[in-house]
């Protein structure tokens, strides 16, 4: 089971399986909509921040489809190396942030931030709040933070390719929770943590975001499972 991404093998395993799962409909359209990527003048827009960019396929997609500049950061040097080698783009800057700091960015210079499947990897709520606070410092007034995670109300439910947690188990906030992604490329097991909807909302509100809202997202169209699979939490700087 993967608990960190500091080896090239772990990063490549993650990239291979998430690509095979067809990542784009897995909550990402709602993220892009929240950041108004399709309606913003890309020539004059400030860059987008991707906090926890992983192997970079989302960032290249944003650059290619929407023409937006992206600053993509990750604590894993292996993920950044993989992103630079496989998903480079003139509009995307990849940066390794081993200490999770964003000090290289100025105050209020970012036009929006996405952070996908990152807060659910954090073992304590104080860390979640601190990361959101660091992000908020970089955002222009009125800019949006869009946080995407799997839906905590669907723990234990088997979707087409994904299951979070064990069936019939009751989790408490902060409990370790195994995520299992099954594709034709193999089985990927990830170490995540259980957090309620209210915990994610708290992380943004405690960091100073306002107008915090939630959206309960269904699985991709090809998956008929009648439960929300993803949770999007949005807040305005």
From Swiss-Prot:
Enzyme class: transferase
E.C. number: 2.1.1.328
Pfam family, one: Methyltransf_25
Reaction catalysis annotation: N-demethylindolmycin + S-adenosyl-L-methionine = indolmycin + S-adenosyl-L-homocysteine + H(+)
GTP-binding keyword on record: no
Source organism: Streptomyces griseus
Knockout or disruption consequences: Cells lacking this gene accumulate N-demethylindolmycin and are unable to produce indolmycin.
Role description: Involved in the biosynthesis of the antibiotic indolmycin, an inhibitor of the bacterial tryptophan-tRNA synthetases. Catalyzes the methylation of N-demethylindolmycin to yield indolmycin, with S-adenosylmethionine (AdoMet) acting as the methyl donor.
This protein's encoding gene: ind7
Keywords from the named record: Antibiotic biosynthesis, Methyltransferase, S-adenosyl-L-methionine, Transferase
Protein name: N-demethylindolmycin N-methyltransferase
Protein family: Belongs to the methyltransferase superfamily.
GO molecular function, one term: methyltransferase activity
Any one biological process term the GO annotation gives: methylation
């Amino acid at each position: 089971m993967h608990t960190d991404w500091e080896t090239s093998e772990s990063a490549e395993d993650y990239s291979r399986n998430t690509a095979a799962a067809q990542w784009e409909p897995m909550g990402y359209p709602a993220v892009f909509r929240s950041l108004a990527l399709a309606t913003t003048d890309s020539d004059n827009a400030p860059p987008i921040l991707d906090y926890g960019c992983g192997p970079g396929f989302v960032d290249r997609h944003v650059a290619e489809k929407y023409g937006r500049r992206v600053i993509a950061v990750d604590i894993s040097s292996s993920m950044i190396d993989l992103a630079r080698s496989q998903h480079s783009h003139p509009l995307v800057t990849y940066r390794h942030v081993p200490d999770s700091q964003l000090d290289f960015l100025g105050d209020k210079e970012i036009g929006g931030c996405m952070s996908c499947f990152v807060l659910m990897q954090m073992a304590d709520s104080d860390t979640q709040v601190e990361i959101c606070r660091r992000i908020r410092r970089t955002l222009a007034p009125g800019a949006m933070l869009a946080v995407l995670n799997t839906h905590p109300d669907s723990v234990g439910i088997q979707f087409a390719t994904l299951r979070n947690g064990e069936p019939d188990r009751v989790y408490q906030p902060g409990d370790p929770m195994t995520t299992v992604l099954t594709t034709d490329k193999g089985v990927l097991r990830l170490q995540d943590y259980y957090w309620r909807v209210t915990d994610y909302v708290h992380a943004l509100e405690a960091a100073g975001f306002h107008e915090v809202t939630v959206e309960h997202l269904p699985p991709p169209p090809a998956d008929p499972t009648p439960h929300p699979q993803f949770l999007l939490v949005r807040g305005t700087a």
